[in-house]
């Protein structure tokens, strides 16, 4: 529930530097959220929350309102109220595959860090292929620790990938060693009308960096068919994979991982490197000198620097090789076609 004693400060304070049009649109969303969501129970609200705090790129302007439901029932009530009142909204997962623009975002941003966070499997099961049920809000790193602790193999390919399980499912995250879809059994989701859907992997058109889900669906969780392994061998395998990743990827810098999908002609990183752009920078955004398909924030980059660098890479690769790179990351901006998304990332 919203603290009404602080209401005037929330409604009257706006981010600096807005044009009159931006100010009107942003303040309208703040007021709308305040008026239609204020009585909801078991939801944490933050106002004018910088999204740079919630993305792995560490860039992004403030959201009109950020909501964190503390239970599944609170999430369902929030989404119902949002749909009934046409509140522009985005569901944001771990923020690992998204670039938020610098300006204020006139929308409600919903995070699932307090809900859809369960992890369970039947320890007494005699099968060598146990089923693990995971909430969409569970960080991938936590899922992997759970697997090691319970000696369950099958998801080692995800080591080093940031973000949440929900985001990993939406984009069918993976590496050269495999993808999350390979272990997926079924998904628990809300469709665009807010109806609960149980979808089996056999019914999903999963492909490269996509699970083939409708844009408006929200992942609540899923089940993964794993195999019994030894905790020691799992640790050894994950450690080996992590050493390789650290040697070839700039894991210590703020980034969103690979920026582009690999085209059929050649890996995107190889094309970018052949175009002479490895290490190239614009402002404090740089094409990584470790992996050319990664753009990193050197510490004080703005989203506009990163976007300009992405556009330059696209134009240079197309000009030299005739290949149009397709973006793997999602862009969240004040534009209306950017909102009402289930980023889950």
Curated annotation (Swiss-Prot):
Gene3D superfamilies noted in UniProt: 3.30.465.10, UDP-N-acetylenolpyruvoylglucosamine reductase, C-terminal domain, Uridine Diphospho-n-acetylenolpyruvylglucosamine Reductase, domain 2
Every FAD-binding PCMH-type domain range: 59-254
Record-annotated active site: 209, 258, 328
Location of this chain's protein in the cell: Cytoplasm
Pfam families, sorted: FAD_binding_4 (PF01565), MurB_C (PF02873)
Catalysed reaction equations from the record: UDP-N-acetyl-alpha-D-muramate + NADP(+) = UDP-N-acetyl-3-O-(1-carboxyvinyl)-alpha-D-glucosamine + NADPH + H(+)
Gene Ontology molecular function: FAD binding; UDP-N-acetylmuramate dehydrogenase activity
Its EC number(s): 1.3.1.98
Gene Ontology BP terms: cell division; cell wall organization; peptidoglycan biosynthetic process; regulation of cell shape
Keywords, in A-Z order: Cell cycle, Cell division, Cell shape, Cell wall biogenesis/degradation, Cytoplasm, FAD, Flavoprotein, NADP, Oxidoreductase, Peptidoglycan synthesis
InterPro entries: FAD-bd_PCMH (IPR016166), FAD-bd_PCMH-like_sf (IPR036318), FAD-bd_PCMH_sub1 (IPR016167), FAD-bd_PCMH_sub2 (IPR016169), MurB (IPR003170), MurB_C (IPR011601), MurB_C_sf (IPR036635), Oxid_FAD_bind_N (IPR006094)
GO CC, alphabetical: cytosol
Cofactor: FAD
Top-rank lineage group of the source organism: Bacteria
PANTHER family with a match to the protein in the record: UDP-N-ACETYLENOLPYRUVOYLGLUCOSAMINE REDUCTASE
Functional note: Cell wall formation.
Family: Belongs to the MurB family.
Protein name (record): UDP-N-acetylenolpyruvoylglucosamine reductase
Gene label: murB
């Amino acid at each position: 529930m919203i603290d009404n004693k602080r209401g005037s400060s929330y409604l009257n304070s706006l981010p600096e530097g807005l044009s009159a049009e931006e100010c009107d649109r942003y303040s309208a969303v703040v007021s709308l959220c305040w008026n239609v969501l204020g009585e909801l129970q078991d939801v944490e609200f933050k106002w004018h929350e910088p999204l740079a705090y919630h993305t792995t790129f560490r860039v992004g302007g403030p959201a009109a309102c950020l909501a964190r439901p503390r239970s599944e029932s609170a999430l369902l009530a929030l989404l119902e109220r949002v749909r009934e009142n046409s509140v522009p909204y985005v569901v944001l997962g771990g923020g690992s595959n998204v670039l938020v623009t610098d300006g204020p975002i006139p929308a409600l941003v919903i995070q699932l860090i307090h809900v859809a966070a369960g992890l369970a499997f039947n320890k007494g099961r005699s099968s060598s292929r146990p089923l693990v049920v995971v909430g969409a809000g569970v960080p991938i790193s936590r899922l992997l620790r759970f697997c090691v602790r319970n000696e369950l193999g099958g998801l080692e390919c995800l080591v080093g990938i940031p973000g949440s399980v929900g985001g990993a499912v939406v984009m069918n995250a993976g590496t050269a060693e495999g993808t999350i879809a390979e272990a997926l059994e079924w998904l628990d989701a809300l469709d665009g009308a807010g109806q609960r859907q149980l979808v089996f992997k056999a019914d999903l058109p999963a492909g490269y960096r996509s699970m083939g889900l409708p844009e408006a669906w929200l992942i609540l969780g899923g089940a993964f068919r794993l195999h019994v392994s030894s905790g020691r061998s799992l640790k050894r395998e994950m450690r080996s994979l992590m050493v390789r990743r650290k040697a070839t990827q700039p894991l210590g810098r703020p980034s969103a991982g690979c920026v582009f999908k690999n085209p059929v002609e050649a890996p995107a990183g190889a094309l970018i490197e052949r175009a002479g752009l490895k290490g190239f920078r614009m402002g404090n955004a740089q094409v990584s000198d470790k992996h050319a398909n990664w753009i990193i924030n050197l510490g004080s980059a703005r989203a506009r620097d990163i976007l300009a660098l992405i556009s330059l890479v696209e134009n240079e690769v197309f000009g030299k090789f005739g290949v149009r790179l397709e973006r793997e990351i999602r862009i969240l901006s004040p534009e209306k076609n950017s909102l009402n998304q289930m980023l889950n990332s």
